């Protein structure tokens, strides 16, 4: 989910950093 995390990183912000 690293690539998906990058897209969500824009939406969720810091939460996306935890995904990536």
Curated annotation (Swiss-Prot):
Compositional bias (Polar residues): 1-11
The keyword Cytoplasm is assigned to this record: no
Keywords recorded for this protein, A-Z: IgA-binding protein, Lectin
The keyword Transferase belongs to this UniProt entry's keyword annotation: no
Region listing for Disordered, in residue ranges: 1-20
GO molecular function, one term: carbohydrate binding
Family as reported in the entry's similarity comment: Belongs to the jacalin lectin family.
Quaternary structure note: Tetramer of four alpha chains associated with two or four beta chains.
Function description: D-galactose-specific lectin, binds the T-antigen structure Gal-beta1,3-GalNAc (Thomsen-Friedenreich-antigen-specific lectin). Potent and selective stimulant of distinct T- and B-cell functions. Shows a unique ability to specifically recognize IgA-1 from human serum.
Protein name, per record: Agglutinin beta-1 chain
Organism whose genome encodes this protein: Artocarpus tonkinensis
């Amino acid at each position: 989910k690293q690539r998906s995390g990058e897209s969500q990183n824009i939406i969720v912000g810091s939460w996306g950093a935890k995904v990536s």
